[in-house]
Amino acid sequence: MLDPIIHKFKYGQHTVILDIGTIARQANAAVMVSMSDTTVLVTVVSSNQVRLEQDFFPLVVNYQERTYAAGKFPGGFFRREGRPSENETLTSRLIDRPIRPLFPKGFINDVQVVATVVSVNPQVNPDIVAIIGVSAALSLSDIPFFGPIGAARVGYIKNQYVLNPTTTELSNSKLDLVISGTESNILMVESESCLLSEKEILDAIIFGHEQQQIVIHNINKLVKKVGKTKYSWNEKEVNISLKTYLSELYESRAQDIYCFFDKKERHAQVDSIKKDIVKTVLNSYQHAAVDEKEIMYLLNYLEAQSIRYRILTNKLRIDGRSQDTIRKIDIKTGILPRTHGSALFTRGDTQALVAVTLGTERDAQNIDGLTGIRVDRFLLHYNFPPYCVGEIGVIGAPKRREIGHGRLAKRGMLAVMPNANEFPYTIRVVSEITESNGSSSMASICGTSLALMDAGVPIKAAVAGVAMGLIKEGNDFVVLSDIVSDEDHIGDMDFKVSGSRQGITALQMDIKTDGITYDIINIALKKAKNARLQILDVMEQIIKFPNQEISKFAPRIYSIKVNPDKIKDVIGKGGSVIRSLTEETNTIIDIEDNGIIKIVALDYDKAKQAIRRINDITANVEIGAVYTGKVSHIVEFGAFVTILSGKEGLVHISQISERRINKVTDYLKLGQKVLVKVLEIDRQGRIRLSMKGVHQVSA
């Protein structure tokens, strides 16, 4: 059994500690990794044998947060962790993306990676810690893996790049970029930025990749010291004669495929050709051990190679476009009459129906994370139903991909969203992907920008998104603009960029091959900018600025400021005043400790009524002023009259009339409206009123 090993190294402003051989020793490998008191236990387990009929790589990555890590109890009735949170799902994807390409081609053994957060420092996000731990565990294990990888978070504060900034530092940063890669290649980038230039983003990528070499160097040192020998596995042998025969058959029919630029027609033609070839091959190999699955696998490979070769040799793409051509765009806004804002964005065969709902602070999402409760007043949800690609499937809770695409679209919009002072609404956006042929997350960003403008949300600028692709063979490469799903599938890079005319708001990059240079990334960024500006030109022809008025179906929010000392008067004893106020005016009233009162109403007149009542309640009674009041109580020596929605004063019997009155009830009745003049307010706040000398006809 391995004796425990502790390895430490400095990483930016933090110290990383790798503990190997202490915990979870029955896994293929386990590492307890810490960075400034944020600790993640990472385990990796693999099966030595392939499951029967297995034909894909079953990698599962689970990132999970334990509330005890922050000294907290889980919420809910059962007081234990349940289904993964959105953050856990997103971090699982963040770990999966850079490690998946580094397993050997053809390797299809089961592999499970589990990263469990067991201690958390609120200033250190566990995601980078988890990626470092996963890299170390896979590299040290006997599982075939071409690592290690590094990971870094890059901030941009006061025009300086900052390695692994703290949570506090990140709140003042114009950039939140996570990058992961090997010693020579970048594999994954995920970023959110405040309208930074292409050069600033590229420099951040270079900075992050250079800095993470510290992690790779230290893991390599550990591997040399205690790394296990990788176990052998049997890669399925390719039937060379079958592959050659299929290549001849496919090439003879390939030109028939490229006659069809429409996705459905092309797929139908491809399926027809493949069926013909399968039938031909099975008849030719009647006595050989060849099955249909093997034939289809090779045909799919040949199809991909054919498309790649066609693009590299400067021929048209599979849908007839040149390298930099954007698909035809069609836009409609305000198409859902009862929603608060809507847009239909169509780009080629990809379509997003986007709806906006405006709500109050009460509609905001309270997220109880490891580092505390935070309030999110901008929600963006992405739905990808099976019908959008012409398939039948199960419809239920959002899958990992939907959660990830929704978060990417949200990141693309955050830089231009108004703050609560500028627009005091909670905003929910839902993007329904009704057709899909690539770049649906980027279509969601375009549709969201349009729908928010239609809803009258004062976003700072229009935002568009585009997905770029790469085909690379040796030193030859082509960067493609606005890729379709087939190009994404056979390509070497998925590069999504969103932004306004002023700069980039979000970037997501996944690379499937080696040899991606900074020059290639720079070219992709420049081409993405050109594509983005073209899309914005089309969007601005439909709607250039946010509507001045919100929908008549949306709630109106009005704010008034009162003396904080008067808040208790608005609330009343046991909430009696505010309760009656909301019921009578059919409004929602929220009161803040600083004296800001927000009135939410669908009816403007009701809102005015509530504001008038609140102003009356919080107004100071002035001596000598005349008020309209209501008789609330009658006694022998006079009557109590309520003025200014709740303040009560006494009209003595001698102050009711110029004439002598023997009985108050002969002159006044309960509920009667009267005009009264304030005579005096004593030290105890008691108000003396008079009806004498006040003309009562107008009361």
UniProtKB/Swiss-Prot annotation:
- Where does the protein end up? Cytoplasm
Name it: Polyribonucleotide nucleotidyltransferase
Record EC number = 2.7.7.8
Asked if the Swiss-Prot or TrEMBL record annotates the protein with the keyword Cell wall biogenesis/degradation, the reply is: no
Q: Which residues bind Mg(2+)?
A: D488, D494
Q: Which cysteines are joined by disulfide bonds?
A: none
Top enzyme category: transferase
